[in-house]
Amino acid sequence: NLLTVEGLFAGYDGQPVLRDLTFDVPKGALIALIGPNGHGKTTLMRCIAGLLKPTTGKVEFSGKKVTGLPAEEMVSRGVVLIPQGDMLFPDMSVVDNLRMGAFLPAARAKFSENVEEIYGMLPRLKERSSQMARTLSGGERRMLAIGRGLLSGGAILLLDEPSLGLAPIVIH
């Protein structure tokens, strides 16, 4: 399995959000977490990405225990989180924002080739490549955040509210 979560408990300020969560994600799988607001989807992704330390339980990634490792260590292992908010660099161009996604050496070496692939999937980004990120529409900013995440070359991509602000044609 690429990811194993076992007996995970997590929450905020003593308030539990996740209770005894257990599941596996095989390599190559596409998994969707569906549920009402406030039921732990973001909390789970934050635990996996190293942004929130679980109260108890275990997270394994590529067969290695990674529970509680810091976010920078998780990124270096190939775990990429695209949060609900844009988290873009507003005063940088679209292409420079995309370049920031390819900060690991292996991704950086293939940036020119991979950015063309992103432009093929999200052609609006190519049209706007020299524009500052702050000038983009909400949907374009979401496309940019997703494109930047894809350029990281991570082994697993965690998208929080992936279709938020996107036009239906882009989602399909």
Predicted features along the sequence, with ranges:
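Short coil-to-helix segment of the ABC ATPase nucleotide-binding domain corresponding to the Q-loop/switch region
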Residues: D91-R99, S129, L159, I169
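A short, proline-enriched helix->beta-strand linker immediately N-terminal to the Walker B motif
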Residues: L150-A155, E161
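Conserved ABC ATPase signature
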Residues: M132-L136, E140
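ABC-type ATPase nucleotide-binding domains, specifically the catalytic core motifs of the NBD
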Residues: D13, I31, L69, V94-E113, ...
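Conserved ABC transporter NBD signature motif
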Residues: G57-K65, R77, K110-V115
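The feature captures the beta-strand-to-loop junction immediately N-terminal to the Walker
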Residues: I34-P36
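Helix-to-loop junction immediately C-terminal to a conserved catalytic motif
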Residues: A49
